């Protein structure tokens, strides 16, 4: 695991997240009353009106967790894995893709779950629940998205040998493309598309990382395509002839 950073770096990460957790526990509190709900931050009230405190908190924290977990997994593993898959020997590239992605995901899993400690503490202080089911699902979906984005980023890094930054950029752009194409899944037939065309588009969309929380990430079509699709494409990319980075 030293390939993904020193133990000192992980210790600093843990201490930073624990410090933020302490701030959250001391400074933030939620209140729900007959007149509405409010959040107290260092004793200063932030009124939320008549909104349910629980629905307000969970609605916002789900999106935060989905983004934070996926980005931490991606950024925590991409650099070392992309360097491993840039090896001159084909066997080493394939090993780097499969073994490196697995180790990178494990490293990102550790970093992301440590990063969520302040979020769990915030949920507990605001609504009295540390691990509500809605946030647990958002955490799991974020891990799946992070793995999917990591696979796509490594694939792009292999194809775009000149720039790892471009590989990350294309991965993030690809994540934003999926929700836009989902419009045609809902209204494609109303626009004159045939059922087969909509089905082909659905398969393509399933391959892409999604910038919004999915409703059925474990369906028989979704999971094999979202993870297996970029994994197969990445493995094929590792078979391409080696080329030096510019």
Report each predicted region and the residues it spans.
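Central hydrophobic cores of alpha-helical transmembrane segments
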Residues: 13-21, 163-177
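Transmembrane alpha-helical segments in integral membrane proteins
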Residues: 66-85, 154-166, 227-246
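Aromatic- and glycine-rich beta-strand/loop motifs that create alpha-glucan
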Residues: 1-19
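Membrane-interacting alpha-helical segments
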Residues: 1, 5, 133, 137, ...
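Helix-loop-helix units of permease transmembrane domains in multi-pass membrane transporters
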Residues: 75-108
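Terminal transmembrane helical anchor/hairpin motif
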Residues: 27-59, 168-246
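Secretory targeting signals
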Residues: 22-33, 38-73, 100-169
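Membrane-interface helix-boundary signature
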Residues: 6-9, 58, 62, 134, ...
């Amino acid at each position: 695991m030293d390939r993904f950073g020193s133990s000192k770096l992980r210790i600093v990460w843990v201490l930073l997240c624990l410090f933020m957790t302490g701030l959250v526990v001391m400074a933030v509190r939620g209140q729900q009353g007959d007149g509405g709900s409010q959040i107290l931050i260092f004793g200063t009230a932030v009124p939320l009106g008549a909104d349910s405190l629980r629905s307000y908190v969970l609605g916002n924290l789900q999106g935060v967790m989905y983004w934070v977990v996926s980005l931490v997994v991606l950024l925590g593993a991409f650099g070392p894995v992309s360097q491993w898959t840039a090896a001159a020997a084909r066997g080493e590239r394939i090993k780097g893709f499969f073994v490196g992605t697995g180790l990178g995901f494990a490293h990102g899993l550790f970093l992301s779950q440590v990063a969520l400690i302040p979020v769990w503490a915030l949920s507990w202080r605001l609504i009295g629940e540390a691990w509500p089911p809605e946030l647990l699902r958002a955490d799991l979906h974020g891990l799946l998205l992070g793995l999917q984005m990591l696979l796509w980023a490594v694939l792009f890094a292999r194809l775009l040998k000149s720039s790892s930054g471009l590989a990350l950029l294309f991965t993030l752009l690809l994540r934003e493309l999926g929700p836009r194409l989902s419009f045609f899944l809902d209204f494609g037939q109303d626009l004159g598309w045939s059922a087969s065309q909509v089905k082909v588009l659905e398969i393509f969309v399933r391959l892409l990382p999604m910038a919004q929380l999915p409703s059925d990430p474990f369906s028989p079509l979704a999971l094999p395509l979202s993870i297996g699709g970029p994994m197969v494409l990445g493995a094929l990319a590792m078979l391409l002839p080696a080329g030096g980075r510019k």
